[in-house]
UniProtKB/Swiss-Prot annotation:
It is an enzyme of class 1 (oxidoreductase). The active site is at C182. The keyword tRNA processing applies. HAMAP family: TrhO. Residues 128-222 form the Rhodanese domain. It catalyses: uridine(34) in tRNA + AH2 + O2 = 5-hydroxyuridine(34) in tRNA + A + H2O. Its EC number is 1.14.-.-. This is tRNA uridine(34) hydroxylase.
Length: 308
């Protein structure tokens, strides 16, 4: 039995690409169901499908997934489950968007062309091939706390920058097997579609993303190093999807390892080595006052996410 399943909150990361011409009409029923069942997190709806991460009781999440699966034309979403000791979200948001994952390139359609899916159990063999180039499609702050052995860091701040990186690094990809990965798989749907559209044929991506790999591949067989950043209050997870000791800098929202917190530039709620030089003394004074109010609120038993 998965020891993590004893934790009180079930976290579901999901996405599905499917034509949803009437996606606006789906927003209110989803929001009502989530609020009625104590579910929190974010769901994105667009004409191309649905994407999001939510948390709640196991029964509540089961109701939500049944509702989503029953949406006409949508079908079974790609799902990754994990568990949390505390509710990892502060509120519930259902948003209408142009894209369910923002790449900013017109005409990219994973339903028409996408890379070859590689199951977690087969991933190690693919990336060990000397003719394979491994590309981390995530952002630089995600790469910084964990990635696969030998993976290239495109040093992007947002996914919108990824297409330009590919164009500028074609020579590193030519004649190679291109193996891409991301947190849960959705960014790779568009990344592999984009790369294939440029004429590359041997394009692969990790099915279910890092989360599925960490869930299914035993630690002793794993070639993952570090933690996997997640976009909720857990901040990061490790092998077996266990909660990690990575925290967020509340000034810039970069992930911080225990080692990062030893920096002379780290002050809780005020700055870290990554953002100290980016902020003015006035900014830091303002953050310090906010942190003071957060601590006072915690002492009173108020919501601990004030200022987060």
């Amino acid at each position: 039995m998965d020891p993590m399943s004893n934790l009180p909150f079930t976290v579901a990361a999901l996405y599905c690409f499917a034509p949803l011409p009437q996606y606006e009409s789906l927003r209110e029923p989803l929001a009502q169901l989530c609020c009625a069942n104590g579910i929190k997190g974010t769901l994105l709806l667009a004409a191309e499908g649905i994407n999001g991460t939510v948390a709640g009781s196991a029964g509540a999440i089961e109701k939500l997934i049944a509702h989503i699966t029953a949406i006409p034309g949508l079908g079974e979403p790609e799902l990754k489950y994990s568990h949390a000791s505390e509710m990892p979200f502060h509120r519930m948001k259902v948003r209408l968007k142009r894209e369910i994952v923002t790449m900013g390139v017109e005409g990219i359609d994973p339903l028409k062309s996408v890379g070859t899916y590689i199951a977690p159990k087969d991933w190690n063999a693919l990336i060990a091939d000397e003719n394979t180039v491994v590309v981390d499609t995530r952002n630089d702050y995600e790469y910084a706390i964990g990635t696969f052995e030998g993976a290239i860091d495109p040093q992007t701040r947002t996914f919108r920058e990824f297409p330009e990186w590919v164009k500028q690094n074609r020579d590193r990809l030519e004649g190679k097997k291109i193996a891409m990965f991301c947190t849960g798989g959705i960014r790779c749907e568009k990344a592999t579609a984009f790369v294939k559209g440029l004429g590359f044929d041997d394009v692969y991506h990790l099915k279910g993303g890092i989360l599925k790999y960490l869930e299914e591949v035993p630690r002793e067989q794993s070639v993952w190093n570090g933690e996997c950043f997640v976009f909720d209050e857990r901040v990061a997870v490790g092998h077996g999807l266990a909660e990690s000791d990575v925290e967020l800098c509340r000034a810039c929202r970069r992930p911080l390892t225990p080692q990062d917190k030893l920096s002379q530039f780290f002050e809780e709620g005020v700055s870290c080595a990554g953002c100290y030089a980016e902020r003015t003394p006035e900014d830091r004074a303002r953050y310090a006052e906010r942190q003071k109010q957060v601590k006072l609120a915690e002492k009173r038993g108020a919501n601990k996410h004030i200022g987060s």
